[in-house]
Amino acid sequence: MPGPASGRLSVAWGSIGDVRPAPTILHLDMDAFFAAAEQAAKPSLRGKPVVVGGIGARGVVSTASYEARVFGVRSAMPTAQARRLCPNAAYLSPRFTLYRQVSEVVMELLHALSPLVEPLSLDEAFVDLEAGGVPAETAAVRAVGEQLRRDIRSATGLTGSVGLAGAKMLAKIASEAAKPNGLVVIEPGTERELLGPMTVRTLPGVGPATAETLRRAGIHTVAETAEAGEAELVRLLGKAHGAGLHAMARGQDDRPVVAERDAKSISVEDTFEVDLTDRTRVRSEVLRLADRCVQRLRAAGRSGRTVVIKVRNYDFSTLTRSETLRGPTDDPAVIREAAVRLLETVDTTGGVRLLGVGVSGLADFTQEDLFAQLATEREAEEAATAAAAEEAAGGTEQHEAEEERPRRWHPGLDVVHDEYGAGWVQGSGVGRVTVRFETPWSAPGRVRTFAVEDPALRPGEPLPLVGGAPAGGQSSEPAILPKFLSPEPGDTGSVGEEISRR
């Protein structure tokens, strides 16, 4: 991401509105969360490329470690393509039990800072520091951000990047600039100078297709986007998208940090690198988004009654469809099924550039009999098709179910052997399963191969990333991550200092 310009911008933006006078909105984004958790749990993978996601022929990458990203692997990429780019990476099925455990620790640290915490996913959240009584001064909020990073490292063994600004959009941009394992402060009053020279892709919701439309109109930077004016952007992109983009380019973002339990709806959406034209891929993405939405529902202790999908087509037209269930639910199968039914009512043949799945009508309980809402007439053949699509999406429920069927030894699965102790599945096939025996606090472990039905081998539970070593071991130390993800002694975020001074 480009840094701020050294001189003042020549374009006339007008005033930056809706930004607080102090950088009291914090955005935390854990670094390569799923992959980093796997590296912390598995000493033999530290410093090596790791890819977490669906591992089948139609699987999709959920998270790639920074070592894998060097080879071009990224989230939402088909796993088959990732294997071609980085054949020597460790490809692991997600372990959502572990990720939720770590997320709960991180969210507890955030709630200690403020009553207003807005989780966006298991590994990302906004925090209103002002509501937590932190003084509205740059030095004070910086100190809070740095202490948070240290606390996260101590409690989980992982790292997170922190952005601080006077508005949510700016705080998120700051945390992106801080990656990996850093802190960036955007001082109120410096927004125009900071944002102006950045590419339009910096702004939320601007994917390759939108950027190309703007490029053809001679608009390349945030400053040029603001200068173009709302009317021109509406002409190019449509009313909603054009007006919203113009406001963001001017730094206008008055959205409050909303505690998830106070939210009226919970939703997630993704803009794609290229328009999706394959119907199967569109369905897989909807399933993946439904899983993410369920994660947020459960993190907030909520359930919802109305399922909504959002589809933005190649021509920027945006459609929404909704279905109201008989009662509130947080069951992933119910929400996926409803989202797919809604998708079937939308024509996507021209190409899809954005998809979203949301749930509204929130409640504090789950109606247990909502499994009855699943379509019962689609039995064996339909179930097989859904299972294949869910594998492509790296779905939460599927992988949890796989963990409950121990004789299907998926890569990354926790196991325990009567003689060798705790370990994880490195691979399986032709009636054999290979296990590496190591723990988060051990040295890289040895490898053994067993028959898949070996009675001495059984599924295990995720081990704590910190504090779990035997007496006399390293129980007080976090797992040691690759050096580039570890802060140097005395490091207080020099990148943040540089940006906040400008």
Provide a role label for each language-model segment.
Residues 436-502:
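Intrinsically disordered, low-complexity linker and terminal regions at domain boundaries
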Residues 166, 218, 323-324, 429-430, ...:
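A short beta-strand motif that forms part of the nucleic acid-binding face
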Residues 1-243, 375-379, 385-402, 410-411, ...:
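Gly/Gly-Pro- and Ser/Thr-rich, intrinsically disordered tail segments characteristic of DNA damage-repair
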Residues 386-435, 442, 447-449:
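C-terminal accessory/binding modules appended to enzymatic or scaffolding proteins
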Residues 18, 202, 210-354, 361-365, ...:
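DNA-contacting surface of Y-family translesion DNA polymerases
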Residues 120-124, 165-168, 302-306, 352-354, ...:
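Short Gly/Ser/Thr- and Asp/Glu-enriched loop/turn motifs at secondary-structure junctions
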Residues 67, 315-317, 325-326, 431-433, ...:
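Short, surface-exposed beta-strand-loop junctions and turns on beta-sheet-rich folds
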